């Protein structure tokens, strides 16, 4: 792609935003926003080193800049890059309005993915990633050894965060970490992730409740026990899947049973007909709203696909 083609893709006002976000404060070597963006895109495309960027700047006629000099410019460009990301998105996403009930929350979809270290050893690492769902920007990330599994403890959470996560995060430790930070959560859970209780501390069975709900979203106030064995109130929200989803789930279960040579219990198979999440959100937020919000989580999976296909994130330099 040449410079002319690149300019056609940029949103209106990108030059003014560059100066407003202080990506360029002094016109030395890099004298205009387009040249800065060219260097940034070159650096991000295909595991380029800082020395590579310095050489590219010289050969492309931008000017002479050291590797350290570019890194300083790159770090100052964070807010401008975020602005570009938000304004270059397709209109349906860019203009999607956050529902009123979510206005006071920073909604984070979290997930993890494997990345491989280059070389003969090919060591596996884990990338833990938090996506702000209403700006579609990275809120935080962390790279750990493969032995560090999915847990909300991998993220720094604060009051006002609403974390959306899949079943891998449905543990007491993750929930405790979230609540201790003053955050809220919507987490999909397994059939028997941990014991759940009624207000009197008696164990109750999730599948028994699922058998009582109809075709509309339902909620159930239950309790879990924290590490101090104290009851903590939460809600389980659930809805029955569509006939097409149930049929697809049955095919997936049969393939899984064949592959693992292990048959699931009838009770577990039954629960696969439903989608259910656990949440700390207040009761005035309906089950329909909570389940609808959870369905936005797939955006973080798309981020991993984009990172790996466009930026080669499948490996660590």
Q: Language-model segments: which ranges?
A:
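Short alpha-helical "recognition helix" segments of helix-turn-helix
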Residues: 52-59
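Short acidic/polar, Gly/Pro-enriched loop/turn segments located at secondary-structure boundaries
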Residues: 98, 113-115, 136
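Single, function-defining residue in the core of a domain
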Residues: 1-47, 55, 64-65, 69-72, ...
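Short Lys/Arg-enriched helix C-cap and helix-to-coil transition segments
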Residues: 80-92, 96
């Amino acid at each position: 792609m040449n410079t002319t083609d690149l300019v056609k893709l940029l949103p209106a006002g990108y030059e003014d935003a560059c100066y407003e976000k202080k990506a360029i404060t002094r016109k030395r070597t890099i004298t205009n926003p387009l040249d800065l963006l060219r260097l940034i895109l070159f650096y991000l495309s295909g595991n380029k080193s800082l020395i590579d960027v310095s050489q590219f700047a010289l050969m492309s006629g931008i000017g002479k800049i050291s590797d350290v000099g570019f890194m300083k410019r790159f770090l100052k460009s964070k807010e401008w890059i975020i602005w570009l990301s938000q304004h270059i998105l397709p209109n349906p996403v860019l203009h999607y309005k956050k529902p009123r009930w979510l206005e006071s929350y920073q909604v984070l979809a979290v997930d993890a993915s494997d990345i491989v270290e280059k070389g003969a050893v090919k060591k596996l690492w884990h990338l833990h990633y938090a996506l702000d769902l209403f700006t579609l920007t990275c809120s935080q990330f962390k790279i750990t050894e493969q032995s560090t599994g999915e847990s909300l403890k991998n993220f720094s959470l604060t009051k006002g965060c609403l974390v959306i996560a899949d079943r891998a995060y449905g543990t007491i430790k993750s929930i405790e970490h979230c609540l201790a930070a003053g955050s809220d959560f919507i987490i999909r859970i397994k059939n028997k992730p941990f014991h759940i209780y009624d207000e009197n501390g008696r164990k109750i069975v999730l599948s028994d409740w699922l058998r009582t709900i109809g075709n509309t979203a339902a909620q159930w106030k239950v309790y879990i026990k924290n590490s101090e064995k104290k009851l903590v109130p939460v809600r389980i929200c659930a809805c029955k899947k569509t006939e097409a989803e149930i049929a697809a789930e049955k095919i997936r279960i049969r393939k899984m049973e064949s592959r693992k040579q292990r048959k699931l219990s009838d009770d577990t198979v039954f629960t696969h007909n439903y989608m259910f999440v656990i949440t700390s959100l207040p009761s005035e937020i309906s089950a329909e709203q909570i389940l609808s919000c959870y369905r936005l989580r797939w955006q973080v999976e798309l981020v991993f696909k984009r990172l790996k296909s466009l930026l080669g994130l499948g490996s660590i330099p």
